[in-house]
């Protein structure tokens, strides 16, 4: 129930428009940046190599199996790196700022995640991290005390809400852009006086609410794993399609064929990685993603058929 309330509250705040969402997100993000940076810097004082090595592959899995089990969570950490591109219509000078934000943001997240999580693994025993619903807060308990840990957890909850706010904003913008290009019904493109696609947001909220109810579990960790795998697969499918489209886009931009061929190796490696990630997420996630993709394809085909009939009727009326 709490998750559903937060979903709706974050969506309603987005009705205030781009600037309000941006300002609020810029404030809330510090609730996670500061604790993570503290762990990655002063956390080394509490770092115990013996605890770290005990947490290294505790189940003695072969390398292949260890990679398979961790790949979905790794990708989850980077989901959303395309947000700058998705929100390009709300960015000043997008041709310059979107590529900078995408590359810089991805590199920054990589450094922060790798540094902070490795330090945590050397502070808190692996079994305690595994059974905790708030691993960052637990780390601050080991570093300081319960009071400071509670303050940190409160700040990170606020930061997570800010991230949810951004996700709701980005999702509504993606559907708005798709609707403007004819891929989704026009209802997703209708905006209020603050340029917020209110009706589309309510439709998305209904879907999110149902998804939250269907994946409900007594264990927060189990529900998190289900949603992570489903989110990774449904996001990786568009990544594959985008990778396959890049050579065509490069040719349209007049890029030399020799340069495109050199990049084909990178594109191929990206496709293989994405397909392996889909496989690693498991059968249930693939089935759920297949259902979601199928629904999207049905909507797309129906929209195209409707647009074709409309254009044909218009042409007949002109003739």
Task: Report residues per predicted region.
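Helix-loop-helix connectors at the membrane interface of multi-pass transporters/channels
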Residues: 1, 35, 90-95, 100-108, ...
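Transmembrane helix-loop boundary segments of multi-pass membrane transporters
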Residues: 19-29, 151-154, 213-240, 254-261, ...
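Structural signal for membrane-spanning alpha-helices in multi-pass inner-membrane proteins
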Residues: 10-14, 36-43, 113, 117-121, ...
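Hydrophobic alpha-helical transmembrane segments of multi-pass membrane proteins
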Residues: 5-12, 68-75, 151-165
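A generic transmembrane alpha-helix motif of multi-pass inner-membrane proteins
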Residues: 222, 234-238, 248, 261-319
